[in-house]
Amino acid sequence: MVSVEDLHGLSAGQASVPDCKLFPQSPSAATRIAVLLAAALAGAAGGVALASAAGPQPLWAVLGAAAVAGGLLSTWSPCGYSSISLLRPDGRGLRAVAGWLPTFAMHGAGYGLGALMLGGLLGGIGLIAGFSGFGSTALLVLGLVGLAYGAHQLDFLRVPYPQRRAQVPHDARQRFPKWVIGGLYGLSLGLDYLTYVQTPLLYMMTLAAVFTGNIAHAIAIVALFNLGRFLPVAVNALPIPDYRVQAWLARHQENAALADGAILTALGAGFTVLALI
């Protein structure tokens, strides 16, 4: 197996190089079962704790943390790779990073606008449908969705995962300044359903936003998810070559899916227990 680091060091005069294959070893069935059981038990215990909590703040804290985690895990989607590799400073050093900051800021602004638009839509749908928060039925639906997609991510169950198989348009970078591209990419990714997102946590956060029946609360949930999507681009401010960032992401692809499955399972178990108590 040839790593990206190995290829980087090959001389320019070499006529050809072996294919680069960065396919991490999939976790064993025993590992996946252990993760599933541990996450379910931890989630159930969390559900019991939430049931005894005074006020909705702990539940909102769990949802907020899950939203940010979902956004971070979406970095392992094609658009996550693309935004990190394409929205890089031109050159190296502090001056290059300073010149790149408007691109970074516009990227964040695009995500913010996407959160306002998608969150406003989801909250409005929930308001029209008559939802008013996380009652037993809403929690049970969220719980079952989390358990199903947790098993899906851990490769125990096949669940439909409809997504738009598209990425942000790479050719746009040839037509606009980079700071404009940063904003356009941020808006495209911040609307969340215009491009492919690999984590089913997006579905849970979408349902949660609708169930609030509150536009401001729905925007907050989507904004936290988008914050998690936006933050990894900050790695471009560090003196780390792009090929190393991409190689690290590729090596941890299976670990990301494992973490995704664990979070979904824990949330599913917790919300199900909370709904039934």
Swiss-Prot record:
It is found in: Cell membrane. Its main location: membrane. It is a multi-pass membrane protein. Pathway: One-carbon metabolism; methylamine degradation. GO terms for cellular component: plasma membrane. The chain crosses the membrane at residues 33-53, 59-79, 111-131, 132-152, 179-199, 205-225, 257-277. Keywords: Cell membrane, Membrane, Transmembrane, Transmembrane helix. Coiled coil: none annotated. This is Methylamine utilization protein MauF.
